[in-house]
C-alpha cells in the first residue's frame, strides 16, 4: 500500500508516499532509509527550534508564536487578497531551502480576539516596492523570513476577515511549520533549477533539457485537484526552492481566473516551462456538473510507485501519476475523492474512485 506510515507532527497527521510492499526487501530497506533521512532532516529542524527556545524565541517554531508585521496587503477582488508578513527579527534559517518540495507545509496564524488559530499555506513570494510586483524568491533568498499568503474571506472565516481588516504594520503572531504531507527523501539529489521562472520564453526549452539531465533519481508524476485558495498547495510544490521534479497534472476550479490575480501569470509560466499540465475550470462559464464531467474525462489512471530508481529520462508529455492530492472546500473534496472526516481521510469516492484510484494513492488535504 502507498499509505502505510503515519507521522504525528504536533496536532497533525501526515502521510508519506512509498512503494508497494510487493517490492524486494532491498528496495524496502532503501526506501525506509530514505524515509528515516527525511524524518531526520525535519527532526533536526524541530530540535534546533526546541533547543534554541530559551536563547531565542524570535525564530519561527511550531512550539510557540512569533511576531510578524503586515508588510503588504493587496485586494484581488472583494473576497480574495494577498498578504505578506515580515518577522520583527530576521530569520536565520531559510525555511524554503530546508523544506524544499519534499514537504507540503503550513503555519498557524492566531486571532487573539476570539482565541482561534487558522492554518495557511505560505508561498515563496515577496512584494517589490519599487516595481509594485510580486516576485518569486530565488535560491538562497528567504527575504529575511517574509511569508506570503493567498487568502479568501468567508462569512464564517473569523481569521481571514480579521486579517483583511488589519492595517499595514499591524503585528500578528504565527507558529509553524506544520507538515501536511511528506514526499520520499531523495538522498544527495541535486536541486532542480528555477531559472526558467525568471527567463525569457525563448530560452525555457533549452534550460529544461539541461537541468533535467542532471537528476540522480527518476522523477515521478502526480495529479493535483484544487479549488479556490487550495491552489496554494500546488504552487508551494512548484515554486519552492528545489521544486517538485516530476510533472504535476493540475486541475484547478475557480469562479473565474481573475480571482487568481498575479498567481495566474505564474501558473502560465510554469506551464510553459513543462512543470505543470494545467487545466482550469471556471464556474462562471460552466455548471458544476459540466465541470465535473470535464474533469472526469481528463483524469489519468493511477500508476504504481516504484521507489527510488536511477534517472533514465524525463517525459513531459505522457504523464504517469502515482499519487493524487485533493485540496479545496469540503464539497469539492467530496465530489473529487469522497468526504474527508477531519484527521480521518475517509474512504475514497467521487470521480477518482470511478477511475480506479483508491486509498493507496489518494490523499485529501485540509
UniProtKB/Swiss-Prot annotation:
Keyword annotations: FAD, Flavoprotein, Membrane, Mitochondrion, Mitochondrion inner membrane, NADP, Oxidoreductase, Transit peptide
Major localization class: mitochondrion
SUPFAM superfamilies attached to this UniProt entry: Riboflavin synthase domain-like (SSF63380)
Coiled-coil portions: none
Alphabetized Pfam families for the sequence: FAD_binding_6
The organism's place on the tree of life at top rank: Eukaryota
Domain FAD-binding FR-type stretches: 63-184
A Gene Ontology BP annotation from the UniProt entry: mitochondrial membrane organization
EC nos: 1.-.-.-
InterPro entries for this protein: CBR-like (IPR001834), Cbr1-like_FAD-bd_dom (IPR008333), FAD-bd_FR_type (IPR017927), Riboflavin_synthase-like_b-brl (IPR017938)
Membrane association type: Peripheral membrane protein
GO molecular function, one term: oxidoreductase activity
Transit peptide: 1-50
GO cellular component, one term: mitochondrial inner membrane
Cofactor binding note: Binds 1 FAD per monomer.
Enzyme class: oxidoreductase
Subcellular location: Mitochondrion inner membrane
Cofactor: FAD
Extra facts: Present with 2730 molecules/cell in log phase SD medium.
Record-linked PANTHER family: CYTOCHROME C MITOCHONDRIAL IMPORT FACTOR CYC2, NADH-CYTOCHROME B5 REDUCTASE
Purpose: Redox component that participates in c-type cytochrome biogenesis in the mitochondrial intermembrane space. May play a role in the reduction of heme prior to its ligation to apocytochrome c by cytochrome c heme lyase. Has oxidoreductase activity in vitro.
Entry protein name: Cytochrome c mitochondrial import factor CYC2
Organism this protein belongs to: Saccharomyces cerevisiae (strain ATCC 204508 / S288c)
Gene name of this polypeptide: CYC2
Amino acid at each position: 500500500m502507498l499509505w502505510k506510515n503515519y507521522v504525528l507532527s504536533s496536532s497533525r497527521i501526515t502521510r508519506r508516499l512509498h512503494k508497494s510492499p510487493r517490492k524486494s526487501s532491498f528496495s524496502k530497506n532503501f526506501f525506509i532509509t530514505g524515509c528515516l533521512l527525511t524524518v531526520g532532516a525535519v527532526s533536526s529542524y524541530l530540535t534546533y527550534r526546541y533547543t534554541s527556545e530559551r536563547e531565542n524565541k524570535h525564530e519561527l517554531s511550531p512550539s510557540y508564536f512569533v511576531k510578524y508585521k503586515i508588510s503588504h496587503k493587496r485586494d484581488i477582488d472583494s473576497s480574495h487578497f494577498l498578504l505578506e508578513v515580515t518577522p520583527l527579527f530576521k530569520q536565520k534559517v531559510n525555511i524554503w531551502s530546508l523544506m524544499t518540495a519534499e514537504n507540503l507545509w503550513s503555519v498557524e496564524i492566531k486571532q487573539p480576539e476570539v482565541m482561534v488559530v487558522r492554518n495557511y499555506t505560505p508561498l515563496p513570494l515577496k512584494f517589490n516596492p519599487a516595481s509594485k510586483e510580486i516576485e518569486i524568491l530565488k535560491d538562497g533568498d528567504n527575504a529575511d523570513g517574509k511569508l506570503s499568503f493567498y487568502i479568501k474571506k468567508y462569512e464564517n472565516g473569523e481569521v481571514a476577515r480579521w486579517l483583511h481588516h488589519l492595517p499595514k504594520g499591524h503585528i500578528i503572531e504565527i507558529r509553524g511549520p506544520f507538515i501536511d504531507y511528506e514526499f520520499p527523501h531523495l538522498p544527495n539529489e541535486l536541486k532542480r533549477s528555477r531559472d526558467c521562472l525568471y527567463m525569457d520564453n525563448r530560452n525555457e526549452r533549452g534550460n529544461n533539457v539541461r537541468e533535467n539531465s542532471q537528476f540522480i533519481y527518476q522523477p515521478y508524476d502526480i495529479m493535483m485537484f484544487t479549488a479556490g485558495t487550495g491552489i496554494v498547495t500546488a504552487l508551494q510544490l512548484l515554486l519552492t526552492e528545489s521544486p517538485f521534479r516530476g510533472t504535476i497534472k493540475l486541475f484547478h476550479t475557480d469562479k473565474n481566473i481573475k480571482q487568481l490575480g498575479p498567481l495566474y501569470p505564474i501558473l502560465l509560466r510554469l506551464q510553459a516551462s513543462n512543470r505543470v499540465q494545467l487545466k482550469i475550470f471556471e464556474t462562471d462559464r460552466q455548471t458544476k456538473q459540466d465541470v465535473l464531467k470535464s474533469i472526469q474525462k481528463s483524469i489519468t489512471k493511477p500508476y504504481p510507485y516504484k521507489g527510488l530508481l536511477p534517472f533514465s529520462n524525463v517525459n513531459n508529455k505522457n504523464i504517469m501519476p502515482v499519487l493524487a492530492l485533493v485540496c479545496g472546500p469540503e464539497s469539492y473534496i467530496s465530489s473529487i475523492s469522497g468526504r474527508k472526516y477531519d484527521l480521518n481521510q475517509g474512504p475514497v469516492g467521487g470521480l477518482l474512485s470511478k477511475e480506479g484510484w483508491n486509498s493507496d494513492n489518494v490523499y485529501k488535504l485540509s
